[in-house]
Structures are given as structure tokens and as C-alpha cells.
Amino acid sequence: MSVLPTPLANQLLIALPALSDPTFSRSVALICQHDENGAMGVLVNRPSEYTLGEVLSQMGIDTVDEHLREQIVLSGGPVHPERGFVIHDDARDWDSSLEVGQGVYLTTSRDILEAMAAGEGPRNALVALGCAGWGAGQLEFELGENSWLTAPSDANVLFATALEDRWQTAAGRIGVDLFRLTDYSGHA
């Protein structure tokens, strides 16, 4: 029996410069679930090729909100790329929702998108297609290999920081300048 280290739900996972996998290089993921069976998160700084207007249209949801239609949908990760994930700050009882922690929620049901289209959705929301997943012990191994940093989730990083700045800003919240780190890591 292994003992699970502190669960990482509601943490930001920040790729270190040495992580060369193109899917995760310079990425920031919000860890939404983490237990002895593995972890699930959503990348929050990878734009997809889609706008929210295109996604809503494909779902048969109309909106007149031009800003909402132009919102970039994130590429949340390589797992279930056809599935939508909404990270937001609205505690309402959506059909399929999980409290990630400290006023941050993950919803996968259509009702939140319908509310957003009607102008009745969360004040702050990120919409992503796909997520990232780690098998049992995989994330812990990658952390031990110095592929990632962790930092507490931060609404400012999630909702008020430009996509292209989230990687550096998330690390800066814990005092790390990623541009001063080498691409090599080791163990003492």
C-alpha cells in the first residue's frame, strides 16, 4: 500500500523549461482531481483553433454576445478532445459540476454554456476542449523528475492574465522566474 502525498487538486501545474513534450511544454494546468488512481487537469494557457461562437453554433446554441462568440476556446489537453470543460467561479448547481476548490469549479454540462449564451453565466469562465490525465503514480513520478512545479490555484492567473503570460505569471506567484532556469535538471 502506498501513501498518497498531499493531493494536488486546486493546484496549478507549471511545466519546467526542461519538459520538451510539445503538448505540455510551457504549459499551465489546473489540477481538478487527484487521488490514488491518478490525476485530471485542464491546460489553461493553450489556445485551440476554435472560438466559443463556433463551438456554440455546433451545439445549436445561439448567442448575440459578440465578445462571447469571439472568446478563444482552450485546448485543455489530449484526453477527450471532443469534450467541453468549463472552469469558472460560479457556485450555482449546474447539472455536472465539481468544486475544484476555493471558489473554482469545473463543469461539463450543456446548461452552463446555455446560461453563458443567454448572458446569465459565470462572471469568469474558461472553456476548453479536452483535458489532461495522469495514471496512478504518473504525476508524482513526473514531479520527482523535475518536469513540473506546483503552485496554489490563483483566480488572477486563471481569469485575468493573458494566455501567453500565464506560464510565467503562475511561476512568478511562487517566486520563480522560469527564464532564469536551465533546461537541465538533476537530483542531489
Swiss-Prot record:
SUPFAM superfamilies: VC0467-like. Pfam families: DUF179. GO terms for cellular component: cytosol. Belongs to the UPF0301 (AlgH) family. This is UPF0301 protein XAC2918.
